[in-house]
């Protein structure tokens, strides 16, 4: 299928490219784009794919008065998972209200917020290389070591949706800028914040073409209208360079560039 990434990606940057649709569990030597929410696509990406609609599902495998065992397809959107958890009084997915994307992408980056992350209630993932148990996956902060396609995952959740945590997590992201963006550019370094470091080197609000390091939160890149890949990439590398020169800290990408 043909996807126009200027319309499909959250940052609204990119051209039209052929994307392979994976309708069944299989090997794929390339990159799965998911919802393209934390993605910056170059003018010449290699081998890109997307899961078929058959992997957009939520299935209850088992439940009792204490917990529920779910299988969720990796094309399922975070907003759908959040709504299901809230409507069914399930604890553990409250933070998904503020993290856009599909389950596959959430797992790939071990997405989370304020100490919560997607791997916490995980049982296993179905990959192109078979089913892999959570205890055999060395997740870390915004990191999953598995370099293969994901198709579905299973979770065990307790009952008791936490409304107080839900509100607190929503407020935690109230300072995020609006507009076309791929979310955070960089992961936060240990004991510090990427946004603070970028602001400290004078780049908050700095623009190149229609790409801008947000004047509300410096670790967000905003596409003001028609930003190019080159404009966005320039700002990312400029911020990395300036922070390293000033603080000796090498910022690590949270955005995926392909």
Swiss-Prot record:
Enzyme class of the recorded protein, top EC level: oxidoreductase
The enzyme's E.C. designation: 1.3.1.98
InterPro entries: FAD-bd_PCMH-like_sf, FAD-bd_PCMH_sub2, MurB, MurB_C, MurB_C_sf
UniProt keyword annotation of Translocase present: no
Ribonucleoprotein in keyword set: no
Catalytic activity of the protein: UDP-N-acetyl-alpha-D-muramate + NADP(+) = UDP-N-acetyl-3-O-(1-carboxyvinyl)-alpha-D-glucosamine + NADPH + H(+)
Gene Ontology BP, a term: peptidoglycan biosynthetic process
Pfam families per the UniProt record, alphabetical: MurB_C
Location of this chain's protein in the cell: Cytoplasm
GO cellular component: cytosol
CC cofactor: FAD
Active site residues according to the UniProt entry: 142, 184 (proton donor), 254
UniProt GO molecular function: flavin adenine dinucleotide binding; UDP-N-acetylmuramate dehydrogenase activity
The protein's annotated pathway: Cell wall biogenesis; peptidoglycan biosynthesis
Keywords, ordered alphabetically: Cell cycle, Cell division, Cell shape, Cell wall biogenesis/degradation, Cytoplasm, FAD, Flavoprotein, NADP, Oxidoreductase, Peptidoglycan synthesis
PANTHER family with a match to the protein in the record: UDP-N-ACETYLENOLPYRUVOYLGLUCOSAMINE REDUCTASE
Family the entry assigns: Belongs to the MurB family.
HAMAP family listed in its UniProt record: MurB
Task of the protein: Cell wall formation.
The protein's name: UDP-N-acetylenolpyruvoylglucosamine reductase
Species this protein is from: Campylobacter jejuni (strain RM1221)
Designated gene of the protein: murB
């Amino acid at each position: 299928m043909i996807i126009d990434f200027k319309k499909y990606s959250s940052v609204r940057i990119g051209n039209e490219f052929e994307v392979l649709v994976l309708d069944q569990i299989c090997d794929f030597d390339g990159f799965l784009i998911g919802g393209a929410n934390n993605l910056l696509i170059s003018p010449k990406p290699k081998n890109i794919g997307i899961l078929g609609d058959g992997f957009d599902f939520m299935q209850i495998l088992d439940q009792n008065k204490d917990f529920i065992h779910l299988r969720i397809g990796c094309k399922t959107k975070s907003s759908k998972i959040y709504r299901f958890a809230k409507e069914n009084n399930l604890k553990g997915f409250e933070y998904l209200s503020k993290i856009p994307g599909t389950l596959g992408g959430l797992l790939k980056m071990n997405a989370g917020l304020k100490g919560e992350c997607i791997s916490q209630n995980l049982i296993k993932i179905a990959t192109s290389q078979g089913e892999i148990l959570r205890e055999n996956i060395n997740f870390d902060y915004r990191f999953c070591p598995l370099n293969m396609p994901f198709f579905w995952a299973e979770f065990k959740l307790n009952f008791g949706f936490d409304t107080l945590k839900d509100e607190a997590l929503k407020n935690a992201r109230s300072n995020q800028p609006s507009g076309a963006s791929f979310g955070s550019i960089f992961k936060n370094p240990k004991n510090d914040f990427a946004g603070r470091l970028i602001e400290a080197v004078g780049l908050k609000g700095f623009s190149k073409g229609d790409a801008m390091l947000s004047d509300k939160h410096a670790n967000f890149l905003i596409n003001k209208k028609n930003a190019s890949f080159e404009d966005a990439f320039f700002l990312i590398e400029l911020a990395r360079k300036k922070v390293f020169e000033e603080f000796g800290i090498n910022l690590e990408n949270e955005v995926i560039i392909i």
